């Protein structure tokens, strides 16, 4: 009788361990792909309107690449940003002398924190999947109202 109790307890512990390892090994691939901005559904809060924009996210084995390309209303140039970070090991990527970028997963929300070294300003971008399958991006910058950008999968 005592032997069967040990097997039951051991089995329960191993099962719990298996589920714990599976949860921590989870890759966040739902946001992977190229997304196109839907300006009419986005809220710019009085900031310069983005005419066109794409975001490409690739999360694989803890390495995350976020590429962003935007063209602002009235501007002749297209702005391109690309961050490659290692969220699994909490790496911080220094992009040139002026920018430090860090990504992390907060449950199913991808958070990209950009710190501008000279000013110390911090911009936080939060990427999440909306209930209708769109990607919602919330951008919080110092001294600005938060903006919400809506993207559709390309």
Can you annotate each of these PLM segments?
Residues 10-20:
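Bacterial N-terminal signal peptides
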